[in-house]
């Protein structure tokens, strides 16, 4: 077994000097059992805490008992453990995709609240191969990457997912566990042929795939404090998609024909303005990508109310923590004239296309004027509200510039 490759992946990505907990997705199944034992072996000499997170999707009658059993197993192995329950109403269609989204949201929220920066998951080479078969059936399941930002937003902000088992097959893992005398839980959903994953497994003899190679990070880009991204016109499609994703605050990047057509227009050298996936694109000598303020007419840039001390994410782009007073976060569009003269003067340094989608903080305690947020440290009038642009770190993570825990 290529166990040395698994340990090398942990060494490559994790910071041995950190004392932040390592979050591990744990179901009690074979893959996650092998993963948890391996992570514990890696973390124990470093005196680093490991937190096993067990998700109960509430899709099987026995799920509560299975969750309790998995939590007990994780604790017996030496990890802290927490059960998480998907309590939302289950959709009649698209259940696998909804369950994936809910699972990642629960895991990300719990990991962040525990102080973890990395969530470690047990996807294998077999999962890579099954994903090919599933996508051939029309599934939206993505190709697991060895290191990637959390796929849910904004719950997963600042959190990375590490998958160190992608070079091992499920059979290899189970053989190793059997030699160690271990037993594991088997989810009956894995045998339910109503689901694409089960059909892919039942097909058998899938060709294992190597993990996907990522595009090299962009050599030239600029992100200003207002959250706009500037890229060269010859930007590769993956990085263009990442810029559109981050500038718009959306959860999923654009793909397919629409992205391909935008790339072609950029390659043509023509000057143009366009919108795509909630972002505005201005192509001149370089490409300016920012939030499309017109999305306000379609429900975007919605007002965010925060109680004193509460934290929230506005429009997927700005994290705001209220101070001693309640506040609302709204878009600047249509409010410029109500700002103090000093604030209006500062707007001249910002590209006109970027201005309408900037955040404004409004005090809900009295009639204090709004505060335009122009940089990460702009404070509310009471001097306590904190505001942080999420765009820079999210873009750097999306294009592979944050490739280790120590640089996140």
From Swiss-Prot:
Q: Which UniProt keywords apply?
A: ATP-binding, Cytoplasm, Ligase, Nucleotide-binding, tRNA processing
Listed InterPro entries: Rossmann-like_a/b/a_fold, TilS/TtcA_N, tRNA_Ile_lys_synt, tRNA_Ile_lys_synt_N
- The catalytic activity of this protein is classed by the Enzyme Commission as 6.3.4.19
Gene3D superfamilies assigned to the protein according to its UniProt record, in alphabetical order = HUPs
Pfam families associated with the record:
ATP_bind_3 (PF01171)
Catalysed reactions, semicolon-separated: cytidine(34) in tRNA(Ile2) + L-lysine + ATP = lysidine(34) in tRNA(Ile2) + AMP + diphosphate + H(+)
Asked whether the keyword Repeat is assigned, the reply is: no
Q: Which GO terms describe its biological process?
A: tRNA modification
Keyword Nucleotide-binding included in the entry's annotation: yes
Record's subcellular location: Cytoplasm
| GO CC, one annotated term | cytoplasm
- Primary enzyme class: ligase
Molecular function, one GO term: tRNA(Ile)-lysidine synthase activity
Annotated binding of ATP, by residue: 27-32
Please give the family membership noted in the entry: Belongs to the tRNA(Ile)-lysidine synthase family.
Domain text = The N-terminal region contains the highly conserved SGGXDS motif, predicted to be a P-loop motif involved in ATP binding.
Its biological purpose is as follows:
Ligates lysine onto the cytidine present at position 34 of the AUA codon-specific tRNA(Ile) that contains the anticodon CAU, in an ATP-dependent manner. Cytidine is converted to lysidine, thus changing the amino acid specificity of the tRNA from methionine to isoleucine.
Protein name per the record: tRNA(Ile)-lysidine synthase
Instruction: Write the gene name.
Output: tilS
């Amino acid at each position: 077994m290529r166990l040395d490759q698994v340990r090398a992946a942990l060494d490559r990505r994790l910071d041995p000097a950190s004392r932040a907990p390592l979050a591990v997705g744990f179901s009690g199944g074979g893959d996650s059992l092998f993963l948890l034992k391996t992570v514990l072996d890696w973390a124990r000499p470093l005196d680093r805490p490991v937190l096993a997170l067990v998700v109960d999707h509430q899709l099987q009658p026995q799920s509560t008992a299975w969750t309790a059993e998995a939590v007990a197993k994780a604790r017996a192995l030496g990890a802290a453990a927490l059960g998480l329950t998907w309590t939302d109403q289950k959709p009649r269609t698209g259940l696998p995709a909804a369950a994936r989204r809910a699972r990642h949201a629960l895991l990300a929220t719990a990991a962040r609240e525990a102080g973890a920066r990395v969530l470690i998951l047990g996807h294998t080479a077999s999962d890579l191969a099954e994903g090919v078969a599933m996508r051939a059936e029309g599934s939206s399941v993505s190709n697991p990457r060895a290191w990637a930002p959390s796929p849910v937003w904004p719950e997963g902000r600042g959190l990375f997912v590490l998958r160190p088992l992608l070079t091992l097959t499920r059979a290899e893992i189970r053989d190793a566990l059997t030699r160690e005398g271990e037993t594991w839980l088997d989810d009956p959903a894995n045998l339910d042929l109503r689901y694409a994953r089960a059909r892919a497994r039942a097909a058998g003899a899938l060709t294992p795939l190597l993990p996907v190679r990522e595009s090299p990070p962009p050599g030239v880009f600029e992100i200003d404090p207002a959250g706009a991204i500037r890229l060269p016109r010859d930007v590769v499609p993956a990085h263009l998609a990442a810029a559109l994703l981050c500038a718009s605050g959306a959860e999923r990047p654009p793909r397919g024909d629409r992205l391909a057509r935008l790339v072609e227009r950029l390659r043509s050298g023509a000057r143009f303005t366009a919108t795509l996936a909630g972002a505005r694109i201005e192509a001149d000598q370089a490409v300016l990508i920012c939030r499309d303020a017109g999305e306000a007419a379609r429900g975007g840039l919605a007002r965010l109310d925060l109680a004193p001390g509460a934290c929230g994410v506005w429009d997927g782009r700005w994290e705001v923590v209220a101070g001693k007073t309640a506040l609302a976060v709204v878009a600047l569009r249509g409010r410029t004239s109500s700002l103090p003269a000093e604030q209006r003067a500062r707007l001249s340094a910002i590209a006109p296309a970027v201005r309408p989608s900037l955040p404004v903080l409004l005090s809900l305690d009295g009639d204090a004027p709004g505060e335009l947020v122009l940089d990460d440290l702009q404070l509310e009038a009471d001097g306590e509200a904190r505001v942080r642009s999420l765009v820079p770190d999210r873009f750097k993570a999306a294009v592979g510039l944050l490739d280790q825990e120590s640089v996140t």
